[in-house]
């Protein structure tokens, strides 16, 4: 892979001051600088957010919407960035079921070793079983010498004559009988004697590299044929293999990888169901035996009253046949036990609500038992008590020894050890063990190499002491981050930008060098690594240093240096460089007198501690250090801290003693971060805000105006800005950066509060101050000053006092927490325990921390720190070191002395500490080595066997344009989408927590492939089927609507939909101004109405607690604590009763703000002679006082209830019945006949009254225009047929009679925008969203160039970028409000293309489905250029190419074949296929024919009906007065560029004219067939037999068989779609999706019906040895031969055979077919079953999805239709199909407004005479066959 520059400019995130950075891909970039300088803002808030959001936006909506919570970074331009992954501390906090072994794939590698070489054993006797897995058999055969001839044999299970005939029909030619090979035909008449030992020869081949795929296919066929048995003959040596063994009625099969996963269904422990934990009930009262499950008899079980648990429990009750309402004591012990502890392989079908689908969906849940579910949570948590009720206890499962594995897996061994024993070994011991393992097998060596590599990563990262079964949730933050790094290294993803957050945290200095090596490996895999680091040693790791500073917060945010590390050390003058050069150092304090008081801790044995006793000095700074895993946390956090807590509770722990001293208080400052929200600020955290608010409330003006302390809190409604609720910012949508509130300009408060000053500053000014400024400002207020000084003492002086805690870095949060504790220091001698307090701190900040910690010891307190940072260790008064290693080798006390004494010892810390004390610390050595190139830049696919693929291996070069060619159904789609796309999605999704990745994996089943390596994140661009077409507009599909809605929400000005006047804003201040103007000196009562539907008693109780005391109703006031009358009218909470006067304006403002905080509407009562009520709502109003809501993003979106049009529900279109438009269709009916057609049982009198009796009985065509309109539209006595039919449609939406009369028409209310009136009247520069949606992209670009503010710059920039890509794919002409489902195939595909490429990322693997098919030749260069640009931008493009048109432009081509279906799926040599070499810029293609056979076209006889034509004069959309005619009984082709109007001509022109002629009966054709381009819509249930209506005849035949009659089986019982016939467990699907929570879905054949879909009883009926389920698996060609006597099915079967689909099973699911196969099916259905009556076929781009082989015979077939008396008009872009027509119509010359004109009409051979034609240069000039 080549290294490319990455540019990021104009970064304004948080404190970054419009900075720009650059670096190269595949570099290690180290971001450094003082804490709070802006490093995390660049790394995480800019680079990570941008890379992640851009890639996620291309994923399916259900996944993308789950994880787009990151705000868009404020940045001007990003170029060259690849998809990003952030690895932070606590990286796996959401991975509830993960262990070290499962996450790093150690267990999956070990399971594979057990599968291939493990010894299966009998669980009872432990005796070895002689079994082979498929992989083991293959591995054994692969060890044979190259070039040896081998025969693969399978035992012959049946030897009778009928069986021999059947084998011969299947293509087998030889058998091996008693050691000798014989031709199979020699036994056709006699059969084979029973006493002969016979094998059938599956295949004979030479073992070579070229034959591996064939070898795999033949071997697996042999095992399937021999039901688990086969043999291999080579050089007269016979090797026999068996995959089954039966002992005591138990059949044992070979070991599989799934057996060694506690999450797999069959392999889990039968007692704990895979959790490894046994939960015992110690208190029997936890279960109330008198209650039922429905009544929640088990207090620890999920609540049955919830929908989720009730559904699951009901499914359990149905499966076990018991009632949920039965008391527990009356349930059988077996059911009780299953409820509590589950049952093996118990899978429940449940219908749960699926949020991604928006409906209930059938899924299958494994029932493990409620106790085992609890055990599962306990197994993976650090706080088991959270899940254990009192009276319950958790123990390791006695049956599986805590592994969760079943007994068969538990006793299996490999290299003398069980899987359980491996799980309990440390990673160091694993490494020692596996380094000794030798294997002659190449495949085993490869697995061992991968496993050893992962172990090396983990050990190099200092994690060797961990055991692989350690739950990730129990690891420290640093351990989790380093485990994540190892996981990513093992995953071998390419092209990722990894962003690491201080990976050296928690790492001892001796392990840092190993960490450096591991991170370099991550880079050398082809990734970019961004490090946020402070560790000096990490400087030697970086390829580039970016130093941010110079200070922190507002004093930072600038790029001080960007370049090579050596230049940084030599030339930079920043604090970081000075500390590295030791120009600045942290001094070691002078030695103190010997301590006089000590703390003694004895008998420390928890975890790996070796019975330690320690002695710690009091009133000193003590450092506890040691290598990772040595026992520091166990000693301090798990032993010392609990002992101190017990001592302070006066429980006198035996292991704690004091010598001449004591501890009176414990402060344990952990690394757990405090709650962070936008409403928490530093002032609130250190408790200084209360004092400041009291100070402002005590000012004279505050006292005069009645402003209290609450008014100065932005979290209280009294003073907070009503618009932003006190936040100071407004968020347009979740993924946008907040913008300053337009009402308070970011000040958080309303104006009256801001008028209160103290020393010239208001409360907002105080919040804007830094701690440095505030410390000086409040110098005269000791209480406030002391608290702010605590921040400054910890170098947080730069921090704005009002900055939300949610925006602080990790280092800032740690110091803020410490400042909080320092403020509340006690006179009691306190022990402060800190766990790595230097986390996130720069060396400069560490110095301040040390000063604070030492000051505490000078006050007599004791400070104990767990620390690896040598700057801290060197200044400690006393040091404890644990070691010497981690895990079992740790837990010893190596040193207990002063730092100076420590460096005299030979310990790991002593070696690291010595240079710091002696002042001999060297500047890190910088090795300017270029990154080593990855070993392989290829995407490697091994053993791909999805669908038709024949276990192929291949390598695809990265950063190339790759074409995958081959016939239809040869495996192209399976390879590109089912394997590459699925593998890439799963690999990328697995880098996220399970709660996120679960959504994507739901839609991504595990691919059938051995291994895929070298993938980058993938993006697919597929053809959309009709069922997947969106009703959204172009603007919505491309993300333009979202940006425009945000833009109008910020800049839009509302106008009245009624008067079009500009609206004025209603705010609390405008309400007060109105009151002062109209009711000055009157008294008012300000109230908040009680919400309708509220429980009045409960509501009032809550309000009483909040301090409200009065209720208002009908002019009366009531105390809330008194008895209230019933049936109160308009009750409202009283906020305030006051006089309207300027003096009271602030109290009025406060009261109104409080009222609005309680409800969206407030009522103000004016106390006059006649009391008057005023109602107000915030928002906008017109001059007459009509109220309108606030302008929000939701209000401007048709996807939200607030914004959508009520008439059309936001769709922009309505269904309409207008009989006036269909008069010709219904002209022959009388009014009474037409009425009774829809309402046969209704009363006819209204129709007769409406029309004269004689007219009601006449045909509609004889009515006058007025009478016909009355009949359609109605009168006062009769609503009209239009209205009646619309009412009928509401109750019978699928009525076949009404559907032809329906038409979609633009909604008159919203004019097609989908927005309500108000939203359509929000304008910018007098332009509304409706105006924009009615224009094209060019108009929008011009509009955007006229507007813009600082707040909207990023939105406008994003919109302009999207418009650029719309232009690139040639769609600028399309109206933005046009619906997506109205686009042509080519337009729709380019729409998806524009969306996917607009992310502008690098290192993506783009997967395209036929990018050049269905395009006009003129558009081909545009798309090819786009694909090449993607490659030039360092991406990989892989595209299927059935037409071979991309191959000439590809860098690499793969050919699959040689045939379709079972005959395809092999990897072919490139020289076996001849493909066209197309010059996209030449007049004539260089090679015209692919495949080789030339098209043979016989011209139709034009004399018959040659004078009959179909004429149209069309005006619609951009087409005006287009006059064109098409001859009938001829092949008529329509060509033209996309968007020129071809489909409009076909459907709005020729189709409607044909319907009119048919209605009049004045045409030579009597039927009309319209065929669109969409592949046939498919569901999980539809198959070929149902689509062609073959299944009913076959079902009827089976039902007529004697056996069916004897069993009383009707034809419906052979249907997979009826309850009587379908298998009840899989609902007739033949398979089950096993929901494995956050693992990819597993598809398994249904065990009940064995995948045959029909119920077992129906499988008893056989015909020629096959039941109906087996018949559905039979190829079409075989069905045609077997059932020639069923006449009804011969026509569809012949059509399928003629088009070349005979290889497909008759019951093949339509959803499983390739696009080419689906199109071929549709073609066969409509065109190969010739209708009996003369028919006009209108075909809209159907043929573009056919492969060349099927397309070769298409002109001949179309010609046969013409010769049979039919007419064909088709749209296509294929030049060969266009020139094969009798008559060609070309529309153009451009798209949209530039199209719609007739360029040519006539014979294709005359096109060269045309001056206007664009097609003529593509059509061959040779003479067409006559």
UniProtKB/Swiss-Prot annotation:
Alphabetic keyword roster: ATP-binding, Cytoplasm, DNA damage, DNA excision, DNA repair, DNA-binding, Excision nuclease, Metal-binding, Nucleotide-binding, Repeat, SOS response, Zinc, Zinc-finger
A GO term, aspect molecular function: ATP hydrolysis activity
Gene3D superfamilies attached to this UniProt entry: 3.30.190.20, ABC transporter ATPase domain-like, ABC transporter ATPase like domain, ATP-grasp fold, A domain, P-loop containing nucleotide triphosphate hydrolases
InterPro entries: ABC_transporter-like_ATP-bd, ATP_grasp_subdomain_1, P-loop_NTPase, UvrA, UvrA_DNA-bd, UvrA_inter
Sequence positions that bind ATP 4: 1536-1543
Function field: The UvrABC repair system catalyzes the recognition and processing of DNA lesions. UvrA is an ATPase and a DNA-binding protein. A damage recognition complex composed of 2 UvrA and 2 UvrB subunits scans DNA for abnormalities. When the presence of a lesion has been verified by UvrB, the UvrA molecules dissociate.
Protein name per the record: UvrABC system protein A
Species of origin: Chlamydia pneumoniae
UniProt lineage: Bacteria, Pseudomonadati, Chlamydiota, Chlamydiia, Chlamydiales
Gene this chain is encoded by: uvrA
């Amino acid at each position: 892979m080549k290294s490319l520059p990455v540019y990021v400019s104009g970064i304004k995130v948080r404190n970054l001051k419009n900075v720009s950075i650059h670096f190269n891909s595949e570099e290690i970039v180290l971001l450094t600088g003082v804490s709070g300088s802006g490093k995390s803002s660049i790394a995480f808030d800019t680079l990570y957010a941008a890379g992640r959001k851009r890639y996620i936006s291309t994923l399916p909506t259900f996944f993308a919407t789950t994880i787009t919570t990151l705000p868009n970074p404020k940045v001007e331009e990003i170029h060259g960035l690849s998809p990003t992954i952030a690895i932070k501390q606590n990286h796996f906090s959401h991975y509830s079921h993960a262990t070290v072994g499962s996450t790093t794939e150690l267990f999956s590698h070990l399971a594979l070793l057990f599968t291939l070489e493990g010894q299966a054993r009998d669980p009872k006797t432990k005796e070895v079983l002689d079994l082979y897995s498929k992989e083991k058999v293959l591995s054994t055969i692969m060890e044979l010498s190259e070039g040896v001839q081998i025969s693969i044999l399978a035992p012959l299970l049946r030897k009778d004559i009928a069986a021999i005939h059947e084998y011969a029909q299947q293509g087998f030619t030889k058998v091996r009988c008693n050691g000798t090979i014989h031709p199979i035909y020699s036994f056709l008449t006699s059969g084979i004697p029973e006493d002969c030992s016979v094998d059938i020869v599956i295949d004979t081949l030479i073992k070579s590299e070229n034959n591996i795929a064939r070898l795999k296919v033949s071997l697996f066929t042999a095992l399937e044929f021999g039901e688990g048995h086969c043999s291999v003959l080579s050089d007269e040596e016979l090797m026999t293999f068996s995959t089954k063994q039966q002992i005591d009625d138990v059949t044992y099969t070979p070991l599989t990888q799934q057996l060694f996963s506690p999450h797999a269904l069959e392999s889990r422990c039968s007692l704990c169901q895979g959790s490894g934990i046994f939960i015992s009930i110690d208190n029997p009262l936890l279960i109330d035996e008198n209650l039922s499950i429905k009544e929640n008899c088990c207090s620890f079980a999920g609540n049955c009253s919830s929908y989720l648990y009730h559904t699951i429990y009901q499914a359990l009750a149905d499966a076990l046949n018991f009632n949920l309402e039965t008391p527990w004591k009356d349930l059988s012990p077996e059911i009780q036990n299953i409820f509590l502890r589950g049952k093996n392989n118990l899978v429940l079908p449940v219908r749960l609500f699926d949020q991604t689908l928006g409906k209930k969906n059938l899924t299958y849940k494994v029932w493990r038992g409620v106790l085992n579910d609890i055990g599962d949570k306990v197994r993976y948590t650090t706080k088991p008590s959270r899940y254990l009720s009192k009276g319950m206890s958790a123990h390791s499962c006695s049956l599986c020894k805590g592994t969760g594995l079943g007994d068969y897996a538990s006793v299996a061994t490999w290299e003398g050890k069980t899987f359980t024993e491996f799980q309990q070994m440390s990673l160091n011991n694993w490494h020692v063990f596996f380094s000794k393992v030798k294997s002659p097998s190449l495949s085993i060596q490869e697995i061992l190499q991968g496993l050893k590599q992962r172990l090396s990563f983990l050990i190099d990262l200092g994690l060797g002491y961990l055991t692989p079964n350690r739950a990730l949730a129990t690891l420290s933050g640093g351990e989790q981050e380093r485990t994540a790094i190892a996981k990513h290294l093992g995953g071998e993803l390419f092209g990722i930008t990894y962003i690491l957050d201080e990976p050296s945290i928690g790492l001892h200095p001796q392990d840092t060098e190993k960490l450096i090596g591991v991170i370099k490996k991550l880079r050398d895999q082809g990734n970019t690594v961004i490090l946020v680091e402070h560790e000096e040693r990490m400087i030697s790791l970086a390829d580039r240093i970016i130093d941010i500073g110079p200070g922190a917060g507002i004093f930072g945010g600038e790029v001080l240096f960007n370049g090579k590390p050596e230049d940084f050390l030599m030339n930079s003058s920043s604090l970081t460089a000075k500390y590295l050069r030791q120009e600045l150092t942290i001094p070691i304090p002078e030695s103190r007198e010997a301590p006089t008081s000590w703390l003694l801790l004895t008998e420390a044995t928890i975890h790996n501690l070796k019975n330690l006793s320690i002695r710690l000095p009091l009133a000193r700074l003590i450092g506890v250090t040691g290598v990772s895993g040595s026992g520091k946390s166990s000693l301090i956090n798990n032993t010392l801290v609990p002992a101190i807590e017990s001592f302070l509770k006066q429980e006198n722990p035996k292991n704690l003693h004091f010598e001449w001293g004591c501890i009176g208080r414990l402060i344990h400052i952990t690394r757990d971060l405090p709650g962070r929200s936008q409403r928490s600020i530093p002032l609130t955290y250190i408790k200084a805000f209360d004092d400041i608010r009291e100070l402002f409330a005590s000012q004279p003006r505050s006292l005069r105006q009645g402003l209290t302390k609450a008014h100065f809190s932005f979290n209280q409604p009294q003073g907070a800005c009503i618009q932003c609720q006190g936040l100071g910012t407004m968020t347009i949508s979740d993924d946008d950066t907040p913008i300053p509130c337009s009402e308070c300009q970011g000040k958080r408060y309303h104006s009256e509060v801001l008028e209160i000053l103290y020393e010239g500053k208001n409360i907002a000014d105080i919040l804007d101050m830094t701690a440095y400024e505030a410390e000086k400002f409040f110098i005269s207020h000791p209480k406030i000053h002391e608290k702010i000084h605590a921040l400054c003492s910890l170098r947080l002086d730069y921090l704005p006092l009002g900055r939300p805690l949610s925006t602080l870095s990790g280092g800032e949060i740690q110091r803020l927490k410490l400042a909080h504790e320092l403020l509340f220091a006690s006179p009691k001698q306190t022990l402060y325990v800190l766990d790595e307090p230097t986390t996130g701190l720069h060396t400069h900040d560490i110095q301040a921390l040390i000063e604070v910690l030492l000051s505490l010891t000078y006050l007599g307190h004791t400070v104990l720190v767990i620390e690896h940072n040598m700057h801290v260790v060197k200044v400690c008064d006393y040091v404890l070191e644990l070691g010497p290693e981690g895990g079992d080798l740790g837990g010893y006390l190596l040193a207990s002395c002063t730092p100076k004494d420590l460096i005299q010892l030979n310990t790991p810390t002593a070696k690291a500490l010595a240079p710091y004390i002696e002042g001999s610390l060297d500047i890190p050595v910088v090795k300017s080595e270029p990154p080593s190139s990855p070993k392989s830049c290829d995407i490697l696919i091994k053993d791909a066997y999805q669908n038709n693929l024949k276990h192929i291996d291949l390598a695809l070069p990265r950063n190339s344009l790759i074409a995958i060619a081959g016939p239809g159904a040869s495996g192209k789609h399976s390879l590109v989408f089912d394997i590459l796309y699925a593998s890439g999605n799963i690999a990328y999704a697995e880098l996220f927590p399970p709660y996120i990745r679960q959504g994507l994996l739901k839609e991504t089943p595990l691919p059938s492939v051995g291994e895929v390596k070298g993938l980058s994140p993938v993006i697919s661009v597929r053809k959309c089927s009709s069922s997947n077409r969106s009703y959204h507009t172009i603007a919505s599909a491309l993300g333009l609507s979202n940006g425009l809605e945000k833009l109008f929400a910020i800049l839009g000005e509302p106008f009245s939909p009624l008067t079009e006047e500009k609206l004025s804003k209603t705010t609390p201040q405008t309400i007060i101004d109105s009151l002062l103007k109209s009711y000055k000196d009157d008294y008012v009562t300000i109230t908040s109405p009680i919400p309708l539907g509220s429980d009045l008693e409960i509501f009032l109780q809550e309000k009483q607690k909040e301090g409200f005391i009065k209720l208002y109703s009908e002019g009366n006031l009531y105390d809330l604590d008194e008895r209230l009358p019933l049936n109160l009218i308009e009750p409202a909470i009283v906020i305030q009763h006051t006089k309207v006067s300027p003096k009271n304006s602030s109290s009025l403002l406060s009261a109104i703000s409080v009222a609005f905080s309680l409800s969206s509407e407030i009522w103000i009562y004016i106390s006059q002679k006649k009391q008057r009520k005023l109602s107000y709502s915030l928002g906008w109003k017109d001059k007459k006082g009509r109220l309108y809501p606030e302008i929000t993003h939701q209000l401007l979106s048709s996807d939200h209830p607030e914004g959508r049009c009520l008439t059309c529900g936001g769709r922009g279109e309505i269904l309409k019945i207008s009989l006036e438009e269909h008069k010709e269709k219904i002209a022959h009916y009388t009014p009474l006949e037409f009425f009774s057609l829809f309402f046969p049982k209704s009363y006819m009198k209204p129709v007769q009254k409406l029309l004269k009796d004689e007219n009601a009985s006449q045909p509609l065509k004889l009515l006058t225009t007025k009478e016909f309109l009355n009949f359609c539209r109605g009168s006062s006595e009769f609503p009209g047929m239009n209205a009646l039919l619309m009412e009928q449609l509401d109750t019978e939406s699928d009525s076949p009679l009404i559907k032809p009369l329906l038409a979609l028409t633009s909604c008159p209310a919203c004019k097609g925008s989908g927005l309500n009136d108000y939203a359509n009247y929000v304008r910018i520069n007098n332009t509304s969203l409706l105006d924009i949606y009615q224009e094209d992209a060019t108009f929008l670009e011009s509009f955007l160039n006229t507007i813009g503010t600082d707040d909207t710059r990023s939105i406008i920039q994003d919109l302009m970028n999207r418009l650029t890509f719309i232009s690139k794919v040639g769609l600028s002409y399309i109206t933005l409000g046009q619906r997506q489902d109205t686009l042509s195939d080519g337009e729709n595909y380019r729409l998806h293309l524009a969306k996917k490429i607009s992310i502008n990322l690098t290192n993506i693997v783009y997967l395209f489905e036929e990018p050049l098919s269905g395009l006009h030749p003129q558009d081909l260069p545009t798309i090819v250029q786009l694909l090449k640009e993607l490659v030039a931008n360092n991406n990989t493009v892989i595209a299927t190419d059935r037409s071979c048109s991309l191959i000439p432009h590809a860098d690499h081509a793969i050919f699959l074949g040689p045939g379709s279906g079972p005959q395809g799926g092999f990897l072919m040599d490139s020289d076996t296929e001849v493909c066209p070499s197309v010059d996209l810029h030449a007049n004539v293609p260089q090679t015209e024919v692919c495949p080789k056979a030339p098209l043979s076209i016989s011209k139709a006889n034009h004399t018959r009906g040659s004078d009959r034509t179909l004429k149209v004069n069309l005006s619609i959309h951009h087409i005006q007065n287009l006059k064109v005619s098409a001859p009938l009984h001829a092949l008529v082709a329509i060509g033209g560029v996309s968007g020129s109007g071809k489909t409009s001509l076909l459907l709005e022109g020729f189709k409607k004219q044909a319907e009119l002629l048919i209605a009049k009966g004045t045409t030579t054709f009597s039927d009309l067939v319209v065929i669109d381009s969409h592949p046939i819509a498919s569901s999980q249930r539809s198959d070929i037999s149902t689509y062609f209506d073959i299944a009913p005849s076959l079902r009827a035949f089976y039902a007529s068989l004697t056996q069916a009659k004897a069993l009383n089986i009707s034809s419906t019982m052979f249907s997979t779609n009826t309850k009587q016939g379908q298998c009840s467990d899989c609902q007739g699907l033949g398979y089950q999706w096993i929901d494995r929570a956050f693992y990819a879905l597993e598809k398994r054949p249904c065990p009940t019906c064995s995948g045959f879909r029909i119920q077992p009883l129906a499988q008893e009926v056989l015909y020629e040895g096959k039941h109906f389920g087996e018949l559905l698996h039979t190829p079409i060609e075989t069905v045609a031969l077997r059932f020639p006597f069923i006449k009804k099915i011969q026509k569809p079967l012949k059509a399928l055979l003629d088009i070349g689909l005979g290889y497909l099973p008759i019951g093949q699911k339509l959803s499983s077919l390739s696009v080419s196969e689906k199109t071929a099916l549709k073609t066969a259905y409509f065109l190969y079953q010739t209708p009996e009556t003369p028919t006009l076929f209108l075909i809209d781009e159907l043929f573009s999805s056919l492969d060349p082989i099927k397309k070769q015979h298409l002109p001949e077939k179309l010609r046969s239709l013409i010769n049979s008396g039919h007419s064909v008009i088709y749209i296509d872009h294929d030049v060969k199909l266009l020139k094969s027509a009798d008559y060609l119509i070309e529309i153009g010359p451009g798209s949209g407004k530039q199209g719609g004109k007739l360029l040519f009409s006539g014979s294709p051979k005359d096109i060269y005479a045309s001056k206007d034609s664009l097609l003529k240069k593509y059509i061959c000039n040779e003479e067409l066959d006559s």
